[in-house]
């Protein structure tokens, strides 16, 4: 039977404490999802905490699968350079493959996106295919699987039909 339990964290050092997460496993088999999702994040943000911290956390988790989902915010950048974006993605995916060598790596491309702003819509139309191509190429180069979520939604502009049906 499920019981309610209380978790208390106390600082024993007297300094600033930053809790990055908690691992509360039941001991029963199942799927553990550990997300570092940040609303508005871009691909470069995954490197911000520092590689050594990421390596330690991935080592403790010992994941069977690492899923990386980026591109939706990146494609809204007016200064996006596809070659630099692909190089950054390739570097990050290469590091993840090294940091979790036993894990399969899955990269999901961005969902189709639209904007009420004409300027942003033009920017997305220009950047979306480049971001998807860069992520696909970087994933393949890192030995990762790639899923094109925009194609699964129905392709370019499909988000509008999803929105009309109140699905997006």
Residue ranges and their predicted role:
Residues 51, 112-168:
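Catalytic His-Asp segment of secreted/periplasmic serine-dependent ester chemistry enzymes
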Residues 69, 108-109:
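Alpha/beta-hydrolase-fold catalytic nucleophile elbow
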Residues 98, 102, 154-155:
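Secondary-structure boundary motif
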Residues 27, 38, 110, 151-154:
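Residues that form or immediately flank small-molecule/cofactor binding pockets and catalytic motifs
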Residues 1-94, 114-116, 165-167:
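Conserved SGNH/GDSL esterase-like catalytic core that processes O-acyl groups on lipids
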Residues 84-87, 91-98, 130-137:
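Alpha-helical scaffolding segments of alpha/beta enzyme cores, especially the outer helices
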Residues 31, 61-66, 100-105, 141-145:
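Loop/turn elements at helix/coil->beta-strand transitions in domains of secreted/extracellular proteins
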């Amino acid at each position: 039977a499920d019981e309610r339990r209380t978790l208390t964290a106390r600082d024993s050092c007297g300094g600033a404490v930053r809790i990055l997460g908690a691992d509360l496993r039941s001991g029963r088999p199942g799927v553990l999802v550990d997300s570092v999702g940040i609303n508005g994040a871009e691909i470069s943000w995954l490197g911000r905490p520092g590689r050594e911290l990421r390596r330690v956390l991935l080592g403790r988790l010992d994941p069977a699968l690492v899923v990386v989902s980026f591109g939706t915010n990146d494609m809204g950048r007016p200064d996006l350079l596809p070659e630099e974006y692909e190089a950054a993605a390739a570097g990050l995916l290469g590091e993840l493959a090294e940091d979790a060598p036993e894990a399969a790596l899955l990269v999901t491309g961005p969902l189709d996106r639209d904007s009420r702003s004409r300027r942003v819509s033009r920017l997305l139309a220009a950047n979306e295919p480049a971001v998807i191509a860069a992520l696909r190429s970087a994933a393949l180069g890192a030995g990762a699987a790639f899923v094109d979520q925009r194609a699964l939604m129905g392709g370019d502009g499909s988000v509008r039909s999803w929105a009309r049906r109140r699905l997006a």
